[in-house]
Every structure is written in structure tokens, then in C-alpha cells.
Amino acid sequence: MKILLLGDYSNLHWTLAEGLRQLGHEATVVSDGDYWKGYQRDVNLKRRSTGRWDSLRYVWDCIRLLPRLKGYDVVQLVNPLFLDLKPEKVLPFYKYLRKRNGKMFVGAFGMDYYWVKTCLDCRTFRYSDFNIGPRSRADEPQNRRLIDEWLNGAKGRLCQRVMEDCDGIPAGLYEYFAVYQQWFPEKTTFIPAPLQLPPIGGEPQTEKADVLPLSGGDRRDGGAEVLPLSGGDRGGLTFFIGIQRGRSAYKGTDVMLRALERVKAKYPERCEVVKAESVPFEQYKRMMAGSDVLLDQLYSYTPAMNALLAMAQGLVVVGGGEPENYEILGETELRPIVNVLPSEDDVFLKLENLVLHPEQIPLLKRQGLEYVRRHHDPVKVAERYLDFWQQTPPRRRS
């Protein structure tokens, strides 16, 4: 098959393309690298800035690329807003792709109209990016902006139009599947995210790298801040937390960082904290290496790509590991994720337990590696995508 993957989040499309190629298919990834993260792609479609001339150049780049974006058996968009343009300008590009290619699929991989609307019902999820129990998080500044854009604005209208028209919707996490099953059950399926894995027999390094802490507030590797140990004791745990500027409250990393700092203050000789703030993907992976524990998202039921990457590298993940995550995978044995509830105190207690009982770390690391090998192998995931694409009947085009 000839497959076009347009846009990328968390390296999902690039890793999927590599799995498809191993199966003998032709896969092309066109993306901007997910902004500053710099993910690999075959065709670079990056907007340099929002200035007038760079905006005109970007539109011209999109138009000039169109002749190369036709004749594919399958086109999969990472999101209804798959170009860095205003929603009303994206729709003509969607129509062009729809008319000149085979089947059209749109991923449920991130922020969109249906995600916001469903989370705000405060019933579908016990907690999410937009609710904790019956309490809405709509008044938080970052969430207010997302609601205005996706629920009440042009982005939402584009999303509804595209999702109603497309042939199928693969959901990459349990939460996205739970949302889209309510709206488009006949054309939604769950497929785990693909992840590049260490080779069998080539286990990831699970001993701490020899990185000496710097004095407080110093930075290393371009974006890492190391909060040093007191007393020089390196027998404790190294905790790693990645922070995206502007999304800390939305993802809950602000709460997790506060809990982690409390643990460090209480056990200064037993833990080290490494923070990475908005660094490119390859640099992020290097900075993560040698840590013991990754703090992931607070309001998630499931591990997203950063957490899966950490487990593949031999880290323990603290984040989303609710029963629904294991059930949708059919996983009845492994429980590698330290599940946390959306409260600072719960995160503190779970982290404190790891510090006080480090003997559980080796088992969690081994289970994490086996977990990603079982469920996120790129070739196995690519096979599931191929089955979904081939079995999905084409819909009448609007």
C-alpha cells in the first residue's frame, strides 16, 4: 500500500511509518516535527514564524506540496487541524486530499472538539484534563483558552466537519477511544501507539549514569535543571520530569513537581531531581537516560508516549495506570505503572513509597520493558493499522 501520514504528535506517525516499511509498504510522513520537538519526517512542512512573510511562505509551501500529496491508498491525518493554519484555511486542503486519494483517516490522538466536549460532561471520566469528578476545570486559564478555541470556535467547527466526513478514526489511548465511541462507534477503533524498542537481549541501561549534580539552579544540556543531593549520597533515586512551557497546569506537571519537591525536601539524601523544560526530542531522550523514575501526566488514565519511551529505557513511570488502561490492552499480568490520583498528596505518598522502598524498582523496570514489548512493537502496531485501513469501507464523500 501507498500511505501518507500527515502531521505528527509524539513521534507516533514516524514510528508507525517505520513499522509499515518493515512490512513492505510505502509510507511518507509530512510534518513540522511537532514544533520544537523536532521529530523525524520525510517532508518538512514547518512554519518559521507567525510573521506576515513567513506566513505567506508557509501557505505557498503547502500549496506547492499538493501535487505530491495525491494518489495514496490511505491518508491519515494526525488531527483535524493538521496544518499550522487557521481552521477555515485548512478545510480546502482537506477537501483536496479527500478528492485525490483513497481512504481518509483522522487520528484521535490529542486535543479536539469531541475531547473537550466529552470531558466537560464530568461523567465519562472520573478525572481528566477538564474535570475532577463532578467539578469542571473549565475556569483554569489554559483550559478556558482551549474551550474557547475547540468547543466554541472555528477549530471546533472544522473538527466536526472532518470527523463526520472521514472514513475511520484510530484512537491511540483508552481515553480517546472512550470519547469517540460515544460519537462515531461504527468507525472508531483502538490501536496502541507504536514505539521503537531496544533489541531483545540489548536491555536498556538501568544503572544511573555518572552525572554529577551541579550547584542549585544551574542548567546542563540546554534545558535540564539538576536539583543537587545534600551530603553527596548517590545511593538514592533519580527522578525525571519534563515540563512544556504553557501546558504545565493543563498536564498537571505543576502539581507533580510540587509533590516531588516535597519529597526531596523530606529526603534530601535519597533523591535527585532532573527537570527538562521544552527541549527537542533527541535531547529529551539523552537527558532521561540514567534516571530511575519518570513523572508523567497527572490527569491521564493511561501512559502516553513519554511514559512509554521511559519504560523502554528502563525507567519506572509515575502517572496514569488505571484499570481501564490494562483492560483495553487485555493485559492481566503486568502492572508496571505507579498510578496516581489527581492530588498533590497522593503523588507525594506514591513518590515517598518509592524512596522508602527502592527494592521494588528493579521489578517495576523489568515489567515496564516487557509491557512496551508486548503492546507497542512498531511492526505489530502497523499490522493493526493495516487491518483497520483495509477493513474499513469507504464512506460517501461530502
Regions found by a protein language model. Name each.
Residues 63-66, 70, 93-99, 129-168:
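Membrane-proximal helix-turn-helix segments that form the acceptor-binding/catalytic region
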Residues 191-195, 199-201, 235-251, 257:
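Conserved donor-binding/catalytic core segment of Leloir-type glycosyltransferases
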Residues 316-323:
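Short hydrophobic beta-strand element within catalytic cores of glycosyltransferases
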Residues 39-41, 45-46, 106-152, 246, ...:
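Acceptor-binding helix/loop patch of EC 2.4 sugar-transfer enzymes
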Residues 359-390:
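A charged, aromatic-enriched C-terminal amphipathic alpha-helix characteristic of glycosyltransferases
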Residues 289-302, 315:
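Acidic donor-binding loop of glycosyltransferase active sites
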Residues 160-165, 169-171, 176-195:
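Helix-loop-beta element that forms the nucleotide-linked donor phosphate-binding surface
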